C-alpha cells in the first residue's frame, strides 16, 4: 500500500517530536512522546527545567464509515491537568508519558486512531511550541500488526537541489527492508527494524522513493515523491497576474502568490493527489513599491493537467505550507466536518493525511460562483435615510428556544418577509468571509475573499442578497481590517518579528489577534481587491469597517496606550479615504461606514469624504430604558447635536458590542421598571422613537425590536460570543409583539417617501429635545403642510401633558400615527397639548403623513383578502401574493387568485407593493 500523505505528516513531526516506540501503533504500550523545543517554531526553546509545560493534545480518528475527524478528544484549551504536563529531560527536550493510546485519550470503540495531534504550551498559553510557521504537530499511528513507516525529515514534499536528507524506514518487527529512488536500489538490509538511507538530490526534478519490507511472508510497501527544486528563476514575462487563481481563455490556470523575501514557491494540488510536480514550480517577478522590494511567484498549469474542480496550497521556501490568501473557498481540516450536508450540499471533503500540517486548502470550481441574478437593477436607499438591521446569521435563525448557533443564510432568507414588513431598508451582516471555526461572530478572519461555509454556499449568499434587493433592502458587509487569525497564509509564511505583513506588537491599544501592518503596500492591495471583489461578485451595497482606530500607520500612535489611540490621527483619515476610493471605483454610491467612535474632528474629516460614522448611544439608551435620568440624553441621535456633520452618523441604541437594554432593565431597572414586563417594553419603544424619528441613519441590533433580554456580556464585562438562544417566540407575548409593532410603525413613518423632507438633515434647527425628564421629551418637524410631533414621557409613574404648537385648528386635522402598545395618549389641538401616560410615547401628525394601520380586506383596492375556516383567500391579483406569519416565515405563495390553508394566527399578505394584515381564527 502507498501512504504518501501519511508519510509527509510523519516527516514534519519527526525532528520536533520523536516517540518510543517508533513507529507508533494503536496497540503500542508504554508510549512516550519526546518534544524537542528547539525545533519548529521554537516558541518554547530554552525554557528552564522549572517551567510548567503542557500538551494540548487530541487524535485524528476514522469511524466505521471511513470518515476521518481531526483533533478529537482534546481537552479545553489551557486544561492543566497533570496528565498533560511534560517532564523535563534535558535542555530543550521534554517528554509526555501516554502509556496506552486509546486509554489516554478515551477513544470510543469503533474508531481507529490515525494520528496524535499536539500543541505544546506554557501553563498560561502565552507561549506555544508548534511546527514551522505555527502549524500543529502530528504523529502518525499505524494499524496493529506488521507495519512499515517511511519518513525523510522534510516539512513538505519538496527539497533543495544538492541538499542531503535521510530516508528512514521503520518496521514494527524485524524484516528485510529495501529502498529505491526512481527505480534504483539505494539500500537493503535483512533482519532489521530500521533502515536509514542518506540521499543527495543532484538535479531538479521529481524523485519517486519506494520502500518494501518483508517479514514472515508479509509484505508492506510505502512510497513518496519528493520534488527537488532550485531557487526560483526570474520570469522572462514581467507581467504580474492578479493575485490568486486565474482561469485563462485556453483553459489553463495561472497561480500568483505574493511572498516578499522568499526564494521559492511550488503550488501543489489535488490534480495529482497532492504530489509535488515540476509543473507547480513558480517563477518570480520583482517590483519596487515606494522604494520597497516585492516579489511575486507565478506559474501556469496547462488545461490538460488541471481542470474543472480542484484544491491546492503553496509550499514556500521548502518549509512553509500555506493556503491561498485570495482563495474564493477554503477547505478547513478542523471544522468542515461539522458542517452538515443540509447547510452545504456537496462540500468537498478535506483530504486528511495527504497534506502536511493540516494546511488550509484553496478550493476552486469553474462553476462554484455561478448564479442567475433575478434582480437586474437595484437602487440602494439614500445613505442619510438608512434604517439598518444588524444581523448575525448564526443566531438570527436556528433551533427555536435553543442556543445551538445553527442559523444559516437560507434560514435568514426565509425570514426576509418579516424584515420587509418591519420596514428596514438595509441589513448589515456580521462578517461572513472565512473565519476560524464555525461558531463565531466572524471577527477572527483568515481568508477575506471566501465565504464562510458554516452559513451556506456561495449561491446561498447570492440568493439572499438578490432577494434583499428585490425587496428594496440593501446589504452591507461588516469587514475586519485591523486583525487576522493565525490561519491567514501571510501570517503563517514568516517567523514572528520578521513578517512584513503583520506587526509583532500592535501599535494601538485595542488589538486582540494578529495586527496588520496597515502601511505595507501589499496589505493595502489586499483590502482593495477584497472590497472590489465583494462589490462585483456578490453585489453587496457597502461595508462597515470594524475598529477603525486600529487602522492607523504604525508611527501614527505616540504609544500603544488608550490615550494615544483615541487621539486625532491623520493617517486613519487618509487610510479610510483610500479605501473609500477603492470602493468608489466600482460603486460611487456604495455605503462606507466606520466604527471609529473617535473625536468629532477626525470623524468630520471622514464625513467630508462621504463616509458615515457609527454613533454609540447605548449607555444613554440603557439609562433611559432603566428609568434613570442621569446620562440619558439622546439628543446625539441627531448628528448635529453630537458635533458631527448632519446626516453622517449611524446612531444606535444597541449593537453586537453593547449590552441589551432589556437585560439592563431586568437587572438594574428602577422600581416600577425592573420586574414589570409591560412597562419595560413600553420604555424600549419610547427609546426607539427617540432614535428612529431623528434625522440621519440608524441601526437596530437583531431582536432589539422584540425586546430581547439575553445578555451579550461575560462576567468580566467582555463580549460573550457564545451562541444565543433563538427567541422568535417572543412575538407570541403581547408586550413584546407590541414593541415590534411600535418599531414597525416608527420605521414606516421615518422611511415613507412622502415623509422624506420631514427628516431632512438640512432642516435647521430640527426640533428635538431629548434630554429632559419630568416635563417630557419632544421631537418636532414640519415640511410644507406636514407636521409631526413626538412626545415621550420618561417618568415611571404619572401622565404628563406637554404643550405643542399645532399649526392647524381642529382635532380632525391630526391623528395618532404611532403610540406605545397598551397606552392611551390624547391630544387637544385647541388647547395645544398632548397627554402621554408614563413610560410611553405618542406620534401625532397631520393626516397627510403616512403611518401603519391594519388594512381591512375591503380597503385593499386592486385585490382583496378573505378568511374562512382556517384558510386565507386572495382575489383580484395582478402579481404574485406572498403570505407571511408574524414571525417572518413564508406561509404560502399565490401566483393567481386562490387560497392557502394556514393555522390560526396573524398573517401579512403582500402583493404589488401593498400589504394587508389579517387574522385567521
What is each PLM-predicted segment?
Residues 191-206, 899-903:
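Solvent-exposed segments in extracellular or luminal domains encompassing
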Residues 11, 853-921:
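C-terminal outer-membrane/trafficking sorting elements
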Residues 830-850, 907-912:
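C-terminal beta-strand-rich structural cap/linker in extracellular carbohydrate-active enzymes
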Residues 15, 334-335, 370, 374-386, ...:
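Substrate-binding/active-site clefts of carbohydrate-active enzymes
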Amino acid at each position: 500500500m502507498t501512504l504518501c500523505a501519511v508519510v509527509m505528516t510523519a516527516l514534519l513531526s519527526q525532528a520536533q517530536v520523536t516517540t518510543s516506540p517508533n513507529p507508533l501503533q494503536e496497540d503500542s504500550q508504554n508510549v512516550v512522546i519526546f518534544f524537542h523545543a528547539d525545533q519548529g517554531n521554537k516558541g518554547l526553546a530554552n525554557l528552564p527545567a522549572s517551567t510548567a509545560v503542557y500538551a494540548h493534545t487530541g487524535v485524528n480518528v476514522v469511524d466505521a464509515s471511513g470518515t476521518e475527524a481531526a483533533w478529537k478528544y482534546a481537552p479545553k484549551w489551557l486544561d492543566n491537568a497533570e496528565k498533560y504536563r511534560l517532564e523535563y529531560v534535558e535542555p530543550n527536550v521534554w517528554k509526555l508519558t501516554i502509556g496506552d493510546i486509546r486509554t489516554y485519550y478515551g477513544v470510543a470503540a469503533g474508531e481507529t486512531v490515525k494520528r496524535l495531534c499536539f500543541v505544546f504550551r506554557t501553563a498560561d498559553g502565552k507561549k506555544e511550541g508548534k511546527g514551522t510557521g505555527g502549524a500543529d504537530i502530528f504523529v502518525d499511528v499505524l494499524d496493529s500488526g506488521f507495519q512499515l513507516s517511511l519518513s525523510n525529515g522534510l516539512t513538505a514534499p519538496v527539497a533543495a537541489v544538492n541538499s542531503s536528507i535521510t530516508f528512514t524506514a521503520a518496521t514494527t518487527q524485524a524484516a528485510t527492508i529495501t529502498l529505491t529512488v526512481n527505480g534504483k536500489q539505494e539500500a537493503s538490509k535483512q533482519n532489521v527494524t530500521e533502515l536509514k538511507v542518506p540521499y543527495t538530490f543532484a538535479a531538479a526534478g521529481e524523485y519517486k522513493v519506494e520502500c518494501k519490507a518483508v517479514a514472515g511472508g508479509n509484505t508492506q510497501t510505502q512510497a513518496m515523491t519528493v520534488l527537488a527544486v532550485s531557487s526560483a528563476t526570474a520570469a522572462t514575462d514581467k507581467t504580474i497576474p492578479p493575485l490568486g487563481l486565474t482561469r485563462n481563455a485556453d483553459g489553463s490556470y495561472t497561480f500568483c502568490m505574493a511572498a516578499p523575501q522568499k526564494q521559492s514557491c511550488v503550488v501543489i494540488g489535488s490534480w495529482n493527489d497532492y504530489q509535488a510536480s515540476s509543473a507547480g514550480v513558480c517563477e518570480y517577478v520583482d517590483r519596487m513599491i515606494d522604494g520597497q522590494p516585492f516579489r511575486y511567484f507565478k506559474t501556469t498549469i496547462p488545461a490538460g493537467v488541471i481542470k474543472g474542480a480542484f484544491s491546492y496550497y503553496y509550499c514556500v521556501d521548502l518549509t512553509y505550507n500555506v493556503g491561498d490568501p485570495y482563495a474564493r473557498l477554503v477547505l478547513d481540516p478542523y471544522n468542515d466536518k461539522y458542517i452538515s450536508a443540509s447547510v452545504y450540499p456537496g462540500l468537498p471533503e478535506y483530504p486528511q493525511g495527504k497534506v502536511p500540517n493540516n494546511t488550509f486548502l484553496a478550493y476552486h470550481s469553474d462553476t462554484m460562483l455561478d448564479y442567475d441574478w433575478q434582480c437586474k437593477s437595484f437602487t440602494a436607499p439614500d445613505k442619510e435615510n438608512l434604517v439598518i438591521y444588524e444581523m448575525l446569521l448564526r443566531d438570527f435563525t436556528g433551533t427555536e428556544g435553543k442556543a445551538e448557533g445553527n442559523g444559516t443564510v437560507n434560514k435568514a432568507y426565509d425570514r426576509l418577509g418579516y424584515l420587509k414588513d418591519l420596514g428596514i431598508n438595509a441589513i448589515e451582516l456580521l462578517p461572513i468571509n472565512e473565519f476560524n471555526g464555525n461558531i463565531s461572530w466572524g471577527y477572527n478572519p483568515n481568508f477575506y475573499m471566501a465565504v464562510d461555509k458554516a452559513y451556506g454556499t456561495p449561491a446561498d449568499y447570492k440568493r439572499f442578497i438578490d432577494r434583499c434587493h428585490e425587496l428594496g433592502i440593501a446589504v452591507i458587509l461588516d469587514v475586519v481590517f485591523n486583525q487576522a487569525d493565525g490561519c491567514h497564509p501571510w501570517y503563517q509564511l514568516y517567523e514572528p518579528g520578521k513578517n512584513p505583513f503583520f506587526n509583532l506588537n500592535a501599535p494601538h491599544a485595542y488589538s486582540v489577534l494578529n495586527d496588520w501592518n496597515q502601511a505595507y503596500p501589499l496589505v493595502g492591495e489586499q483590502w482593495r481587491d477584497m472590497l472590489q471583489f465583494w462589490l462585483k461578485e456578490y453585489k453587496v451595497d457597502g461595508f462597515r469597517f470594524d475598529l477603525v482606530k486600529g487602522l492607523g500607520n504604525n508611527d501614527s500612535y505616540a504609544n500603544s496606550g488608550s490615550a494615544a489611540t483615541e487621539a486625532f490621527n491623520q493617517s486613519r483619515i487618509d487610510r479610510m479615504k483610500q479605501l473609500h476610493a477603492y470602493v468608489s471605483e466600482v460603486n460611487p454610491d456604495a455605503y462606507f461606514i466606520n466604527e471609529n467612535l473617535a473625536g468629532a474632528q477626525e470623524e468630520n474629516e471622514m464625513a467630508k469624504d462621504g463616509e458615515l460614522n457609527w454613533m454609540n448611544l447605548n449607555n444613554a439608551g440603557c439609562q433611559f430604558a432603566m428609568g434613570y435620568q442621569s446620562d440619558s440624553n439622546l439628543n446625539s441621535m441627531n448628528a448635529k447635536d453630537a458635533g458631527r456633520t448632519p446626516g453622517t452618523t449611524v446612531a444606535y441604541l444597541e449593537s453586537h458590542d453593547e449590552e441589551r437594554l432589556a437585560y439592563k432593565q431586568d437587572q438594574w431597572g428602577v422600581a416600577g421598571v425592573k420586574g414589570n414586563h409591560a412597562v419595560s417594553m413600553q420604555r424600549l419603544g419610547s427609546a426607539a422613537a427617540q432614535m428612529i424619528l431623528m434625522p440621519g441613519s440608524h441601526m437596530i441590533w437583531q431582536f432589539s425590536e422584540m425586546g430581547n433580554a439575553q445578555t451579550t456580556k461575560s462576567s468580566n464585562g467582555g463580549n460573550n460570543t457564545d451562541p444565543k438562544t433563538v427567541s422568535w417566540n417572543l412575538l407570541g407575548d403581547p408586550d413584546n409583539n407590541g414593541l415590534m409593532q411600535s418599531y414597525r410603525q416608527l420605521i414606516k413613518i421615518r422611511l415613507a417617501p412622502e415623509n422624506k423632507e420631514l427628516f431632512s438633515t438640512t432642516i435647521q434647527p430640527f426640533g428635538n429635545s431629548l434630554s429632559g425628564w419630568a416635563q417630557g421629551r419632544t421631537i418636532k418637524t414640519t415640511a410644507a403642510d406636514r407636521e409631526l410631533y413626538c412626545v415621550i414621557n420618561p417618568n415611571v409613574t404619572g401622565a404628563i401633558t406637554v404643550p405643542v404648537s399645532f399649526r392647524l385648528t381642529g382635532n380632525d386635522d391630526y391623528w395618532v400615527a404611532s403610540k406605545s402598545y397598551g397606552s392611551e395618549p390624547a391630544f387637544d389641538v385647541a388647547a395645544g397639548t398632548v397627554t402621554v401616560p408614563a413610560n410611553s410615547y405618542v406620534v401625532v401628525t397631520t393626516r397627510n403623513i403616512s403611518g401603519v394601520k391594519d388594512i381591512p380586506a375591503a380597503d385593499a383596492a386592486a385585490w382583496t383578502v378573505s378568511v374562512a375556516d382556517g384558510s386565507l383567500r386572495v382575489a383580484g391579483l395582478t402579481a404574485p401574493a406572498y403570505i407571511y406569519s408574524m414571525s417572518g416565515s413564508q406561509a404560502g405563495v399565490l401566483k393567481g387568485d386562490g387560497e392557502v390553508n394556514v393555522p390560526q394566527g396573524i398573517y401579512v399578505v403582500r402583493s404589488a407593493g401593498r400589504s394587508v394584515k389579517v387574522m385567521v381564527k
